[in-house]
């Protein structure tokens, strides 16, 4: 019996150690990088892809930068690349091209050579978007160095300050007599005074006279219409 208890204790202890080792181990191990012969140095591999464009048309001017310019790699004719002699750590891998833009990728290398890749997000640093390894970096589109020339439209013509300065006074002259009661003498005097304040140059025609003539024409027409209606009414009687 004591031997059986000892065996059970040893079995339980082994199970506990196994559970602890499993909890501290990596549940999702990444791919192992190719180790170099000169110590704990590894190789970052991947491929750059530009949809619809031949690699020969843009790879000659493109470079692979690891952590700025600490490590520099070049692209092959098929778009693949390999950056050698990289120690373990966390690095930002980006492809620099004057023709196309690529999203940077962060690669984490453990001391055992396991690789993990994720997108770099400078705004939401806590957000992790896993990427496959070896890297498959696609171009986001061509660079835009110049702004598109704006085309001419009717709104540009109507919103021109010179056009507005010419059109607005005409609208005021045409619509104001229809809105304001021109038969009121006090209202007419106030309008004449306000228009004279806007006309300080004596060489220009007097605005008050123009407004008086304009209102007098409207009042004479209304008076003539009233007289005509009255005469028609007397004739009917």
Curated annotation (Swiss-Prot):
GO CC terms, sorted: EMC complex; endoplasmic reticulum membrane; membrane
Q: Where in the cell is it found?
A: Endoplasmic reticulum membrane
> What residue ranges are annotated as transmembrane?
157-177
Q: Kindly name one Pfam family recorded for this protein.
A: EMC7_beta-sandw
**Keyword field contains ATP-binding:** no
User: Which residue ranges does the entry give as Lumenal-facing topology?
Assistant: 24-156
GO biological process entries: protein insertion into ER membrane by stop-transfer membrane-anchor sequence; tail-anchored membrane protein insertion into ER membrane
Q: Which residues lie on this side of the membrane: Cytoplasmic?
A: 178-237
| Membrane topology label | Single-pass type I membrane protein
Principal localization reads endoplasmic reticulum
| Job of this protein | Part of the endoplasmic reticulum membrane protein complex (EMC) that enables the energy-independent insertion into endoplasmic reticulum membranes of newly synthesized membrane proteins. Preferentially accommodates proteins with transmembrane domains that are weakly hydrophobic or contain destabilizing features such as charged and aromatic residues. Involved in the cotranslational insertion of multi-pass membrane proteins in which stop-transfer membrane-anchor sequences become ER membrane spanning helices.
Q: How is the quaternary structure described?
A: Component of the ER membrane protein complex (EMC).
* Name used for this protein in its record: Endoplasmic reticulum membrane protein complex subunit 7
Native source organism of the sequence: Danio rerio
